[in-house]
Every structure is written in structure tokens, then in C-alpha cells.
């Protein structure tokens, strides 16, 4: 079977049978199209023509950068390999090949990258940089509510902008967050986030709304707030607050997890709140808190 035809069938399977989100599917499509392009350049068109050495050569080229493409980091090449593995696993399951040639291909080695976080005072400065007084604009009020939700729940930006008004509940006081694979989780949100969301619903959202859209966070035209606009709001707040750290879309999520663990929360509870399918993913934050402890020890202990 032609690899491109197989790729289209597989992506349809992921959308229909697995229920992957449109964002995840778009990412998979980009990775698999890059793989197909590379195979065609190597004059390989049929899935049966691919060997383990072929996949290994592809990963090496991802790291080097070929055909005018920039080299990928080890982590990015590793994610691309995961997609390729998924395609070959599907080919085996469908009986199109007799062996999964990608199963034993190792991802590029990468050093452990500890996620960047903000301290508690930095988070407070970040959020307080957005006006809340009577002169605050509807966008200011919306942005403050958005940041409070991101830090108060650990939601991904894509999850936060995907919230519906009906996802906000007061009895109990939780947000219904829809994560990867359309999996839902109920996450408590604290008094500061609740107050900011309530203020937004009363003072700002009616001014932004141009119709009856059920989406919680709206843009200035009354439509759903995009991930890019939410990210811009976070960067704008960081600029107002004078925070020099390199803020990423996941910074508040990382900070949420780190501060919970530093406060004594069990790692499996944090796993549930973040919506991680495996506790291994969450344990990266235990390394962050351990590193913080080592830094304090080095600066304070007389024999450090």
C-alpha cells in the first residue's frame, strides 16, 4: 500500500475511532507528511519497502536538517518518531506488513529539561499587573480571569480557551476541563480564580458577546478567544509586570504543579489535576522541587 494512502487512512482512524482533537490531528498530519515527503525523496513509496534502517536514517536526518529544513531538537525528533511508530503499528495491525520496522528504533537521546516556572510572588505580580479597577477594559477583565484560571487549575492554554460557560460550576466549585483525547476532568479552582471569573461573567463577557456563543472566553469581536491571543495576553501581562523570564504558554501550568508539590500535594493528585495519563510525566515536577531544594542548600549551608 502507498505510504500516503496509508497515512490518510490512519489519520481518519485517529479522528473517528480514537477521537483525537483537531489540534493533535493537525500536529500528527504535519509530522506524517514530512515523513512521506522524505520517503518520496528517497524513492520509497510503498509501506512494504521500508526497513528499520530507513526509519533510523529518517530520524538522523531530522536531527541534521535536510532538504532546506532546520534541524530538529532531540525532543522534537523524538515526538516525530512517535508519530512514525504509530503509522507502522497501524500498518501491522491492518495486516499490511508482517513486522513493525519502527518498533525498535530508539529516539534521540536528550538531557532532562526541567520546565521553567515562576515563583509565587512572580505569579502574583504577573496577575496583579492586569487592571481590575473601574477603568479596566473588558479585555483587561477577561485576561485577568484567563490567567487566574490557567494558574488556578493548571489547564493548558488550549483547554482554557476551549472552556464553555456551562463548564463553570459553583456547587461544587470546579471547572470541567476537556483535555487530550476529549477526556474530561473536574478541577477545583480557588477563591481568587472564582472571583475573577465571576467578575468577567458580570462585567466583561456581556460587553464582548455579539451573539449566543457558549464559549467562556471571547475575543473583541465576540468569537472564541484563540490560543494565539491567549498566549499574547500572557506575554503582555509579563511585560507589564517586568518579568524578564522567558514566559511560555505552559509557564503557569508548570508553576501550578510545582507549587502544589512544594506545598505537600501527592504527585498522583497533581497527575489527576493536570490530566496526565501517566504519573511518569508528572514526576518531572518532583525534579524541579528537588532542584530548588539543592539551590537553597548550596546558598545557605556553611559546608555546601
From Swiss-Prot:
GO-annotated biological processes: cell division; chromosome segregation; DNA transposition
InterPro entries (alphabetical): CB, DNA_brk_join_enz, Integrase-like_cat_sf, Integrase_catalytic, Integrase_recombinase_N, Integrase_SAM-like_N, Recomb_XerD, Tyrosine_recombinase_XerC/XerD
Superkingdom of origin organism: Bacteria
GO molecular function: DNA binding; tyrosine-based site-specific recombinase activity
Alphabetical UniProt keywords: Cell cycle, Cell division, Chromosome partition, Cytoplasm, DNA integration, DNA recombination, DNA-binding
CDD domains: INT_XerDC_C (cd00798)
Cytoplasm recorded as keyword: yes
UniProt-annotated location(s): Cytoplasm
Active site residues per record: 156, 180, 250, 253, 276, 285 (o-(3'-phospho-dna)-tyrosine intermediate)
Family per similarity comment: Belongs to the 'phage' integrase family. XerD subfamily.
Subunit structure: Forms a cyclic heterotetrameric complex composed of two molecules of XerC and two molecules of XerD.
Protein name, per record: Tyrosine recombinase XerD
Amino acid at each position: 500500500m502507498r505510504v500516503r494512502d496509508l497515512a490518510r487512512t490512519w489519520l481518519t482512524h485517529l479522528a473517528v475511532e480514537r477521537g483525537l482533537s483537531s489540534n493533535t490531528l493537525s500536529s500528527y498530519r504535519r509530522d506524517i507528511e514530512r515523513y512521506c515527503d522524505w520517503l518520496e525523496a528517497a524513492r520509497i513509496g510503498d509501506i512494504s519497502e521500508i526497513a528499520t534502517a530507513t526509519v533510523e536514517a529518517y530520524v538522523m536526518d531530522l536531527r541534521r536538517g535536510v532538504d532546506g529544513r532546520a534541524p530538529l531538537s532531540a525532543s522534537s525528533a523524538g515526538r516525530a518518531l512517535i508519530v512514525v511508530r504509530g503509522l507502522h503499528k497501524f500498518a501491522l495491525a491492518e495486516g499490511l506488513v508482517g513486522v513493525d520496522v519502527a518498533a525498535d528504533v530508539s529516539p534521540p537521546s536528550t538531557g532532562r529539561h526541567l520546565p521553567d516556572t515562576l515563583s509565587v510572588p512572580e505569579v502574583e505580580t504577573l496577575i496583579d499587573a492586569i487592571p481590575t479597577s473601574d477603568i479596566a477594559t473588558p479585555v483587561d477583565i477577561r485576561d485577568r480571569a484567563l490567567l487566574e484560571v490557567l494558574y488556578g487549575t493548571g489547564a493548558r492554554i488550549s483547554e482554557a480557551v476551549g472552556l464553555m460557560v456551562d463548564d463553570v460550576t459553583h456547587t461544587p466549585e470546579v471547572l470541567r476541563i476537556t483535555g487530550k483525547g476529549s477526556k474530561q476532568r473536574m478541577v477545583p479552582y480557588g477563591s481568587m480564580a472564582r472571583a475573577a471569573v465571576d467578575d468577567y461573567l458580570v462585567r466583561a463577557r456581556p460587553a464582548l458577546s455579539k451573539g449566543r456563543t457558549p464559549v467562556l472566553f471571547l475575543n473583541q469581536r465576540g468569537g472564541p478567544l484563540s490560543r494565539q491571543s491567549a498566549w499574547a495576553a500572557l506575554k503582555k501581562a509579563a511585560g507589564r509586570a517586568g518579568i524578564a523570564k522567558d514566559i511560555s504558554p505552559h509557564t503557569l501550568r508548570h508553576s501550578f504543579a510545582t507549587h502544589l508539590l512544594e506545598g505537600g500535594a501527592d504527585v498522583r493528585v497533581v497527575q489527576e489535576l493536570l490530566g496526565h495519563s501517566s504519573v511518569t510525566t508528572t514526576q518531572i515536577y518532583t525534579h524541579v522541587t528537588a532542584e530548588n531544594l539543592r539551590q537553597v542548600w548550596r546558598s545557605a549551608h556553611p559546608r555546601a
